[in-house]
Structures are given as structure tokens and as C-alpha cells.
Amino acid sequence: VSRHWPRRLKEELDARGLKVSGGTAFGALHRHGAWDSMLEHVRQVAALTAAAGAHHLVLIPPMYRDEKTGAFTESPELTAEQWAGFGRAADRLGRLLLDEYDVRLVLHPHADSQIQTQPEIERLLNESDSRYTNLCLDTGHVAYGGGDNLDLIRRFGERVGYVHVKQMDPAVLAQVAAEDLSFGEAVKRGVCVSPPAGVPSPAEVVAELAKLDAELFVIVEQDLYPCAPEVPLPIAVSTREHLAGCGLSGTRRPNVPQ
């Protein structure tokens, strides 16, 4: 990243009246030998994130299956040794980001990664320090891994630092389990759907988040690939209207219907 990029990014955002909620990077905290290269990449993203005035960095673990071929590239489960160092590595990175960039680390569970199921998410949270490592709750990926979003919010609400709202089609999830599909193939089959279809219910998620004593960025997503360029905009409009009906809008705190 050129040393001029952070300044240029800030200028371009300001010229368009845009604000950035956070940065996103991919990184393997369980691969001890990859720390230096991972940190170099994350530092570049953190510098741009801070320059844009944002204070969150979403870290997504690598997938253990090739997204295009479905081939396994490593074990779906971490070894005891890898787990032993995972929380420490996350905290080390989170502390560095906070001290040097004033950016908070939030880890993002992801389909076909070793942080996918609810037990894996809970283990990550239990083995890390809330001062440095917290959760980007992606409701769709949690559902994909068989987790309970509402339960996670209720029991680990203080660790939810950032949110991605997304819904999954239960029928396609059943195909994933029955046919051992990769996430890439699941997306091609339409696993990500627009509300009110799919799980979890956005209304229930918003209502549970509203109970937290926290101000959170909630990013609305729907994975669509491949897709024609004209497809996303109508979906974005209808999704915005539905979520507004659930009480989620541009306000600082959800106005949940009683």
C-alpha cells in the first residue's frame, strides 16, 4: 500500500460524503508460520481503516475448502495445539490494532472455516480477552454452521462488536448437509436469500440486539455470485424496506415495534 493511499482514500470519501464503518481483512491466526505475512496484510487494511475514520477491523478466517472446486485444502477442525494458540494470537493482534491504529478487532465466523459452528465460536470467545478480541456476528454464517444467533446474543452480548445481517434458505442448507456441498456451491444454489425468507428472522435478531447496551454497526449483506449487474439494486431496496419495518434503519438505535 502506498503511503499516499490513506490520505487519498480520505479525500475521495469526503468528496462523496461517504463514511466507512470498518475495514475487512483475511487472516489465519492458527498458522504460526504465517503470522508475519498475515500481519503485513492486516496492517495495510488497518492503516486505510484508520485514515477513513473507522474503528473496527473485521478479520475473516481462511476457508478449508476451495470455493470453486470444493476440494479440501486443510482439516476442517483445529488441533489442540492450534486451539491453544488461537486465542493468544487473536489477542496479540487485537492489542496491536488498538494500540497502534485505534481500531478494534472483531472476528467473523465463516462457512467452511474452522470458526463456523457455535461450539467453535464460543471456544474462540472463551479463550480470548474481551479487551482485544470480539465478535463480528454474521447471522447468516452462524445459521449456516447450525448455530443459534439469538442464544449467542443473549449469552455473549457484551462480545458482539459488529454485525452482518444475512439470511440462509433452510432448503439449501439441507442440501449442504446431505450432499457435503462447499460454500461456493451453496451460494450458486441460492443459499443466501432476501428477507422475509430464510433464517434467522431479521425481526428477531434486531429485537434481541436492541436489548444490548451498545451502539453497533449493522451491515446488510446477501451473497450473490455469479449474478447479473442489474440484480442487486432491487434486492437492496426491498431488503432496506423490510428491515426498516423490523425497526432497523439509519438511526443510532433500533426502534423496535412493540
Feature-to-residue mapping (PLM):
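Acidic-and-aromatic substrate-binding clefts and catalytic sites of carbohydrate-active enzymes
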Residues: 1-8, 28-39, 65-67, 111-117, ...
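Hydrophobic faces of well-ordered beta-strands that scaffold small-molecule active sites
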Residues: 20-25, 57-59, 105-107, 133-137, ...
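Active-site acidic/histidine proton-transfer and metal-coordination neighborhood
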Residues: 31-135
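A short, acidic, amphipathic alpha-helical segment used as a generic capping/interface helix at domain edges
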Residues: 196-212
